[in-house]
């Protein structure tokens, strides 16, 4: 089980990223617009840098919903490979069966 503080920190980052997503996208689109003067683009870059680092989507870590494990998370299910194996072995994940040949 992961530390509760790590899980909460990641949840905080998700909320912050969602709330500032539109603002970041607008700034990025203006920065990449070649019709804007260089000085204005530079000021836009500085305003983007003023935003919180945690508002960037790249700071979000995929974590297992059950254990909080940060590695080996299967995106389709949102759980780690260990828990997926455990739950699918018991038949609790719909559509997944243990294969044998």
From Swiss-Prot:
Q: Which domain of life is it from?
A: Bacteria
Question: Protein name, please?
Answer: Small ribosomal subunit protein uS14
Q: Does the keyword Thylakoid apply?
A: no
Q: Where is the composition biased (Basic residues)?
A: 10-24
Segments of this protein annotated with the region Disordered: 1-24
User: Is-annotated flag, keyword Glycoprotein?
Assistant: no
- Which BP terms does GO give this entry? translation
Alphabetized SUPFAM superfamilies for the sequence: Glucocorticoid receptor-like (DNA-binding domain)
Q: Which PROSITE patterns does the record match to this protein?
A: RIBOSOMAL_S14 (PS00527)
Q: Which family does it belong to?
A: Belongs to the universal ribosomal protein uS14 family.
| Keywords, sorted A to Z | Ribonucleoprotein, Ribosomal protein, RNA-binding, rRNA-binding
Q: Name one GO molecular function term.
A: structural constituent of ribosome
Q: What does this protein do?
A: Binds 16S rRNA, required for the assembly of 30S particles and may also be responsible for determining the conformation of the 16S rRNA at the A site.
Q: Name one GO cellular component term.
A: cytoplasm
Q: How does it assemble?
A: Part of the 30S ribosomal subunit. Contacts proteins S3 and S10.
What InterPro entries does the annotation carry? Ribosomal_uS14, Ribosomal_uS14_bac/plastid, Ribosomal_uS14_CS
User: A Pfam family for this UniProt protein?
Assistant: Ribosomal_S14
């Amino acid at each position: 089980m992961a530390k509760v503080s790590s899980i909460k920190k990641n949840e905080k980052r998700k909320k912050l990223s969602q709330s500032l997503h539109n603002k970041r996208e607008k700034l990025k689109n203006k920065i990449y617009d070649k019709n804007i003067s260089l000085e204005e683009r530079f000021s836009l870059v500085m305003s983007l840098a003023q935003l919180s680092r945690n508002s960037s989507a790249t700071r979000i870590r995929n974590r297992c919903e059950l254990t909080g494990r940060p590695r080996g998370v299967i995106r389709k299910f949102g759980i780690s490979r260990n828990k997926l194996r455990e739950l699918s072995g018991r038949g609790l994940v719909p559509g997944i069966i243990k294969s044998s040949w």
